[in-house]
Amino acid sequence: MLVRFGRRSGQAKESAEMKNCEEDPVLYPPLLPTKVDLRQVTIIPHNEWERIRDSLDSLTREAACLRAERKAKKEMHLRSQEVVKHWTNTYAGMKEQKLEAKKKRDEEIEAERQILDIEEAIYKQGERKKAIELAKQYQFYQTERVKNFHSGLLLSRVMKERDAQIEFQKSKIKSDKKWEEQVKLNVEKAFKEEREKAEKQRRERVALAKDHLKQIKEHEEEEERRRKEEEKDAEEIKRQNSLYEIEMKKKQGKKKEEINESRRLFFEHLNDKHIIKAVEQQQQEEEDEKIRKFIKAKKRLTQMGKEKEAETHRLMEERRKRINNFLSKLMKEKFDNEDLIIARDIAEAEAEWEKREREKYEKNKAELKAIAEHRALVMKNKEEEERQRKIEATEQMLAILKADQIFWEHEKEKKQKADKERREVQDAHIQQMAKHKFNALQAKQAESEYCRLTEALVAEKEKEFQDYAREVIESESESTKKYIYPLVKAVQEGPGGGRGPVLVDRGGLRPSYQANDTTGVQLPFYNSPGSKYNNFQKSKGRLGFTW
């Protein structure tokens, strides 16, 4: 439908216009909905239409103008901010410059502080190294060998000073014999004190060696006692294991007796169930016989009903034939309306009779169907009861089998638990023995490692001491070579400065006697100072002699 400006001149024009619209719907699209009566359409001029449209769209145009103005202002503001962003003669620019200058000053101060911290750390590290070196030097000077070496150094210097004083006194007073004798006595006394001191040190070394031997013997006795205790513990563990096995055998025998008794009771219960099942089966057979008799009677009644129905049908057919014959005779004899009415009445009576017979037949059929449904329901109930009884019997049997299985599983779990406990006890004993052996081996290894580290530390300390002593001896020997014997004696290895072999296994001990090998066994000495056991003075005194 197309509406144009102007007035209509008639229906034919509208029809032609409709035809054109139907032929070309694309060029002139409809401006109004379909099925609109053009007589109800108001036609307005174009100016009026523009005025109405402007009045309707004025708010939208004003809102669009406002949005455009706000957008233009915002864009101008952003451009202004972008332009003045890097200006330095504004408050924001000066503030940013001050912040950057402050940040730069803070970074410089932080860099200076870091440099000072690094220098302080380096200085403290150097101080710590100096303190560590001083402590090491002090600790080195506090060792026994260094003290003995310093004592020898002091003795050497004292002897040198003493000789110098003696020479000075000799050059000053050559005629004083008494002074010389006194000096000689002092020297002899000093040598005597030295010999006594050496003898005392020798006795101390012998006592120390005896103490070491005693400690070694005590360690061996302790090891033997520990080994005996371990053997005793092992025997006790074996005895406990044998007692445990005997007890477990007793428990297993008792469990077997309980299992046999449970099995006997179970078989008795099964026998009773079989008897009950036979009685129930006999009762079920009797009930089945009754049902079969009932079904036979029902079948006989059904057969009789069918025979009666067939007889009834035969009688009806005979009567229908008689009636048809009678009607045919009447039709032949009379063809008037009265005969037709009578025939119609007879047909209606026959139809009514057939209807009653059919209803009776339907009723009998419904009764027979109800009887069959009742019989099927009874049979179904019997079958359902039988199935339910079989299901209950099966469930009861499964419950018994499940209980028996649970019982055997419980017994198996108990046996497994007992075996597991026995294995755990055995494993615990084995682990304990292995732990003892491992601890002993670990202790031995730790002792060996300790001895090795001790020997390495002793070797390092000995090297450091020898270097220090060599430097001191070389510096002292430059002035005089006469009094460096105490220094050489203090430098010699081994306690007491012995001349025997170095015993590595005994902590670097160097005995003061000759030995055959590194074991330290003393060789026989042919020049004995005297008999050790033949004291003739005691023998003569015991015999009564006085000379």
Curated annotation (Swiss-Prot):
This is Cilia- and flagella- associated protein 210. Expressed in trachea multiciliated cells. The keyword Metal-binding does not apply. It comes from Bos taurus (Bovine). Microtubule inner protein component of sperm flagellar doublet microtubules. One of its GO terms (biological process) is flagellated sperm motility. Microtubule inner protein (MIP) part of the dynein-decorated doublet microtubules (DMTs) in cilia axoneme, which is required for motile cilia beating. Residues 210-237 are annotated as: Disordered. Keywords: Cell projection, Cilium, Coiled coil, Cytoplasm, Cytoskeleton, Flagellum. GO terms for cellular component: axonemal B tubule inner sheath; axonemal microtubule; sperm flagellum. It comes from the Eukaryota. It is found in: Cytoplasm, Cytoskeleton, Cilium axoneme; Cytoplasm, Cytoskeleton, Flagellum axoneme.
